[in-house]
Amino acid sequence: MKITYGIIVLNGDFLLRQAIESIYDSAHAICIAEGSVSYWNSQGVTKSTDDTLKIIKEFPDKENKIKLISGTWKEKTEQCQAWFNLVPNDTDYVWCVDSDEIHTPENIEKVKQYLKEKNPTSLGFKSDSFYGGFDRIIGGFEREHSFKRILKYEKGCTYLTHRQPTLELNGKPIQGNDITGNQLFKDTGVTMWHGSYISPKQVYEKIQYYETAVISKGNCIPNYFKDVYLEWVNGCDTKRMAIENKWKGVQEFMPHTRGASFTEKYKGKHPEIIMRDMSELITKFDSQLQEYVY
């Protein structure tokens, strides 16, 4: 089975190297669209200013699997369409990956076998979304949401939309056998390790974007980064509990829009790549945290 991975990224160097490494061996190709969308263009940001490009260009791509395009786009759908245009025609499935998602070889093999058995149109994941470090994940609606990541590839198909990822063929969305993350978890035990709320810098920039994005504009907690994320990260257990009780969790969306999202202790095992680099990642985390002292 030939799986092509697709990544969109801007200033995502915190876990990008580990993310690429975790999927490289299983990849038919890794297609990356690096650059900015309209919001960042309006702020004068047109490309990554951290080590994102360095990580991609210096990754030991011995099998020439990595295909990179840099540019600016209207929105994330257009950015995804850019990497999708690089997908080889003999691909069986495309797997959308965030720059802070890590997949283990064992889980990838389970997923590949599952794809062979079920032949789904799309496949979602239940997410272990880490918050403010490596010990706790976001529960509630975040935990129950199905993050659609894998899409069946048909020759001649095009990328329709980013939210949630959907392909189309002959002007019609490719739909049918769509399997959710909860079903995948029930059948295989597979979840998605997602470092989406670890890096202070990336959380700060994510919230700046989300506060203007169509999907979340007007629905975010005011001063979320300072009053929720930073206060939680720097707080004691009592302080953290008070913050979560006030906002019914820690997700940036106002609780009335999506429901509760209290944190939970992570009970799983970190991927070997994360354990190997944990000391380095904690040092990066602490260094970034010092940049946001109010």
Located regions from the model:
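Short beta-strand-to-loop acidic/aromatic patch adjacent to the donor-nucleotide binding site
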Residues: 83, 90-104
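Acidic donor-binding segment of Leloir-type glycosyltransferases
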Residues: 20-69
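Active-site beta-to-alpha loop of glycosyltransferases that engages the nucleotide-sugar donor
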Residues: 5-21, 36-37
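Short, conserved alpha-helix that lines the donor NDP-sugar binding/gating region
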Residues: 53, 57, 76-88
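Catalytic-site signature of metal-activated, phosphate-bearing donor transferases
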Residues: 76-81, 102-294
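Short, acidic/glycine-rich phosphate-metal binding loop used to engage nucleotide
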Residues: 70-76
